Structures are given as C-alpha cells and as structure tokens.
Amino acid sequence: MLLVSCLIILLHLQNALSQIIPPNERCVTAVYTAYEYLSFSGQPNKGLWAPRCRNRLHVLSIYAASDLYCSDAEREAGFAQLDDQCRQYAGVDLIPRQEFAPNLTHEAISQMRVVEFGELPKKGPLDTPILISKSYYSRVFRTIDAWQFELWSHYAFGYLGYAYWTVVIAAGALHKLVLHAISVKRAPSLPPFPFLLLIYYWIQTNLIIPAPLASSRRRLLWWTFPGRIHAIVVLLFWILSIVLCLIGYRTFSDNIYWPDISAQLLRYVADRTGILSFANVPLLWLFAGRNNIFIWATGWSYSTFNIFHRHVAWIATLQAVVHTILYTVLFIQSGNAWKKMQKPYLLWGTLAMLAMILVFPFAVDWFRRRTYETFLVLHILFSVVALVGCFYHVIIFEDHEYWFYLWPAVVIWVSDRVLRLIRIVYCNLHVQLGSRSRFQCTECVAAYDKDADIIHLELTPGSGLQPAPGQYYFLYQPFRLTGWESHPFTLGYWSYNDGAPSTQCRSLKRDTTTDVSEIPLLPDTPSSGSDYGSIDTSTDPPERKLALRFWIRPYDGWTRHLRDQCLQSPTRIIQPNILLEGPYGEQCPLWKYESVLLIAGGTGIAAAVPYIQDHILRSSTGQTSTQSIHLVWTARQPALLRDIAGRELKQALSRKDFRVSFYVTSESASQGAIMDGVEFACGRPDLQAIITAHAEEARLGSSSVLVLVCGPSGMAGLARAAVHQAMRWGCRSLRYVEESFDW
C-alpha cells in the first residue's frame, strides 16, 4: 500500500518537473511566446502551434529575435524543445534554420522593423518579418520566468509538506527505538554519552509528557490534544501550511498575462492553495487508515494519527475554500463569471469543496460520539464525493498531472479495506482438517448486567489468535441493516474454555474454564502489535478454545441496540452474530519496570486487566522485572467493581505483589466492601498524591516505574500533569503510557 503510493507520488514528481521549462530553454520560449501577440500573413495562420512551426514569416521572426537575445547554448536547447513540441502538438516539423540563412545575416536582421509590446494590433496580419524590442523581450521573459517559478514552487511546497511528516514519523520511530533501548539498558549500563540521555529526558519532561499548556487542560484554542508534543506537531504543520500559502510570489507591473499585481497575486495564490490542498489528500487517507504502517513504526496510537488526520483535513479544506473564492473573484473581474462557473470541471470542483466542508459539522466530538453510525455514513459519503469531484475538477489538464495526488488516496483506501477483510476472515473463520466440523466461525454470548450497566461480551474466535495486553478489536454485527459498521473495543480478558461459550456469559462453567495464568509460560515470541514480545499461547491443548472478553458500556447507536436485544431476553443473555476484526494495538513492555501503577476509569479497566494477567503469567517463571503493581480503579457503580474483582481479578487479589484501591463515584454509594477483604472508598482518588507517592518511592529505591492510564480525558489529564510534576522533581525513571481510543 505505502510502496505503491510512494511510487505514484515519485512518478508525479517526475511528471511535475517535466512541466517546468528548463532555464536554458526559457529564452527561446520567451521569444516565440512574444510573437503570439502578433499576426503574420501567409499559411498556416490558424491555431497556436501550426503558425509557430510552419508560417515562414512567423518562424523567421522567431529565429531573428533569438539570434539577438539568446546565447548559442540557449538557441540549441530552445529550438530542440520547440521542434519536439511542433511534432507533439501540431504533427509537423519546425522549419529548419537553414532555409532562412540569407535572411538571418547581421545586416538583414538590422534592417527588420522593431516593435514594442502592444504597438501593433494582433488582428492586423504583417507581411514582413518583425523584431521584438529588448524591452518587449525582457517583459515576456520575466513573465515566463515568474510563471515557471510559480509552477515549481507550487509543486515544491507540496512536497515540503511530505518532508515535514517524514521528519515527524522518523522522530517517532527514533523515539520508539530509544524507549526500547532504555528499557533494555537500565541504570547499571547507561549509554556512553550521558549528555544524550539528559537531552532525551529534557525532551520527555518538557515536550512529550506535559499537557499542551501549563495547566492540565487538554484544550488549546478550540482543539483538544492529549499531550504537548501532539499540539506542537499539529501547530507547526499549521504554521508551515500558512507560510507556504503566503510566500514565494514574483509579481511585477509589466506582466503580460496579468498587468495588475493584484490579479497576479489572485492567480498565484489561487493555484498555490489548490495544489497544496491536493497534496494533502494522500496524507488525509494515510492517517485515517487502521492498517497504517506508521502506527507500527512509531508505536503511536491510532488516536494520535486520527488527530493528524483531522488537522490535515482542516487545512486541506481551508485551502480548497480559498482556492474557490479567489478563482471566483478572478472570474468576476474578467467578466462572464456565471457562464464560466457553468463549465463541468468547475462545477465538479465546487461540489468537491462543498463536500469537504460538509464533513466537518458531522465530525465534531459531540455529534460523532452520540450518533457514530450517522457520522460514519456521512463521513464516507462526503469523502467519496469530494475525491470523485477532485478527479473531474482537474480532468482538463494534459496527462492528468494532478491525478497523481489523488490515486494514492484510492490505493490507500482500497488496500486498507482489503486488509480489513483479510483480518476479518483470519479472526472469524478457521479450517480444521479431520474434524467433524471443518469450518469454525466466531461464536458469541452477550449478557447485560443492569446493576453495573455493562454488557459482558464473550467471543470464541474461529482462528488461533494470540491475545496480548494492549490489543483492541473492531466488532461487527453483520446481519443488521448497518452490518458493515464496526466499533472498537479493548480486549479486557481472555481464557480457554472446553467447547463453545456458555449460555450464561457471566456464569461460565468454572470447571471447564482455564485462566491463562494457569497455562505454562512458553518462550517469548513477537506479537503482531509489538516488537517487545508477548506470551505465546498458541500451543494450548487442542480441545480448549480461546475466549475473548469485552466490557461494553451501552450509550447510543449500536451499543444501545445490543443492550436492548439483551433486555428482550428473559435471562438478559443472547447469542448474537458478531465478527471480530483485529488485533490492533501495541503492547507496552510493562514487565521491564520494577514498579507499575495502573489507573483505570470505568470500563477503562479493560486496558489494565490484561497486563495483570500477563504479569501473573510471567512471574510464574521469573520472566518479569515487576516487583509490585498498584491498581487504582474508579467506577460509577459498585456492581462493576464487585463483578470484575470477584472473577477476573480474583487471583491477582491474593498476591503479595498486587494491591488495589477501588473508588465509587455514585452519589448513592456508601463506603463498604466489594468482596471479602476488599473495600472501596467513595469519591474520586487524589491522583496527584498517589502518583507523587509512587514516583517518590520508586526514586528512593532507584527503581523504574511505569504509570498506565485508561479512563476519561479528565482523569488522564490529571494523571499526565502529576507525572509531569514528578519528572520535573527529578524522577527520571518514570514512564507514562496513556491507553485511549478516539474515533
């Protein structure tokens, strides 16, 4: 996908450069362009290229003026180019210079009439060769030179955007590499250049970890960013995009195309913004894809690239709007604006611009979170309309040179959809030779817990997936009217069952369920979502089936529909047809840190439990450096705490290296016990105090510490601010990881 897109863009670069007239050809080009404002008698005298190539008076005048104003090298290159264009566009050869040799002597040229620009009307045919004056030639040359510079700058500035994101991605990949190196080589074996480590810690403390502003608030202007580095990357691209639209314009008052400087600026800026908008189209589709290779290369989340996607979309849309407005002004100034606007390619361009604008009202957080299905349909519809409109808008250009910006988007979109389909088949269909049922598909049980307001979803996939912490899947309910929609959920827990899921999702047969912590630890193998390694459970007993568990909070749309389906059952348990797509996500090497603090809010516990599972599994054979884990979990309903603490966390609660702090925010709750020996407190935790104490304890013990947070944005903002403060106070062995999914 990425390789094909890069090849298309490189071909576009080659094609774009071929449109730029080389400097050694511009002298002759300026000469024959100047003669387009004069008319000569004789044949041929119709069209653009035929008179320029075969009208004897016209061609003789071009040769004569070139002898005066061009060097030998410029004449050789320029006339070779003109001859090629005569064959390409007129199907004829340029009249050779030898046929005019007697008329091109110094004496003959000196006797030719010299004219200034605008001195002779174009409609009056001339019956003698004419020389253009030096000022006439200079004026045309400056015009062509300025136009060629503008063409070059339009393309070059578009590629500057690609260069910017290349640097950003490279920095992200380097950061991932440094993180891996630091987690492997701890304090006893620091790198030979400690000042490089100090620079890295300074970047972490001042650029990567903090909130966008000094406070813990995530809003900057009217945008939301998880961290300061996200805001910096986005704002720099905004600045770059604005600057590239404002600089690099060569204007002068004698321009033969647009004598008025304001008209020159209107045309140049209109072209610049249109081309830059097109240049952003491949980035738009690349950053929106689930199967984005840069997610793996950098270790950044899908949410991070989604932030980039939104801002590139904002910029591309504003550039398209400016492009449309400025061309409308140009049409009004030149007259017959309404007639020009009725041309099909302009109507397609206007439609594309309007579709880009209409995407935004339905993509705001408020609308997207409440009516995700509607947002998804409209987002795809308007995006396709915009892309098709862009194709037809530039169909009038030779060689379809601007399609090179659009085809990568098509390739990226198709490739991403094909890879999604492959993942769906892999996750949900499994062929077993020699068994009674050769084809096995995903089986599902969903149960709604009214007290906890949670849907417990357990799926037995049809393939040999290797679950790991940090994974998330997209879920489809294919037999709904909108069955093509998918919704992301973090994998909360996994186990191995004898046969299909129980018909009582929350009362699974305990004698036929094997917790992964009871399975012998196998050698580490890299997982699909991590280069740190994961636990390989692929050799489990063949009679046991993997069961994946998800906790879903019903809101609007599909989750509410699933809850209503459960409520229609007397037992609140159903067996819907649900398909998996995945796994996605990156596993954090939690086992390489001596102390771990897990902070979860509500169903954010799904991000923490798999790491606890993984820790129990690794600690049974000593394949972990983690000595203590502290889980701080806040939920609205005590029932949710009680349910998961009594099942998924039951084994962990009996361990000495694991402790919990449960908080209930419901106003009707009173302090009490979740289960025997496990209590909860009312209200919200003091994350500042908890993180500070944890970091100080780790600093005094010279141990590494990791803080992993998954919860509401307010909770994550407070945790990030507390971690930032601890790092400023000198806790350099502290790492912050935020698990979130924003769509």
Curated annotation (Swiss-Prot):
GO terms for biological process: cellular response to iron ion starvation; copper ion import; intracellular iron ion homeostasis; iron ion transport. Disruption phenotype: Reduces ferrireductase activity and decreases biomass production during iron starvation but not during iron and copper sufficiency and copper starvation. Increases sensitivity to hydrogen peroxide. The chain crosses the membrane at residues 154-174, 193-213, 229-249, 275-295, 312-332, 344-364, 377-397, 402-422. The keyword Oxidoreductase applies. Keywords: Cell membrane, Glycoprotein, Ion transport, Iron, Iron transport, Membrane, Metal-binding, Oxidoreductase, Signal, Transmembrane, Transmembrane helix, Transport. Its main location: membrane. Induction: Expression is repressed by iron in a sreA- and acuM-mediated way. Residues 273-389 form the Ferric oxidoreductase domain. Heme 2 binds at residues 323, 393. Heme 1 binds at residues 309, 379. InterPro entries: FAD-bd_FR_type, Fe3_Rdtase_TM_dom, Fe_red_NAD-bd_6, Ferric/Cupric_Reductase, FNR_nucleotide-bd. Residues 503-540 are annotated as: Disordered. PANTHER family: FERRIC REDUCTASE TRANSMEMBRANE COMPONENT 3-RELATED, FERRIC/CUPRIC REDUCTASE TRANSMEMBRANE COMPONENT. Belongs to the ferric reductase (FRE) family. This is Ferric/cupric reductase transmembrane component B. It comes from Aspergillus fumigatus (strain ATCC MYA-4609 / CBS 101355 / FGSC A1100 / Af293).
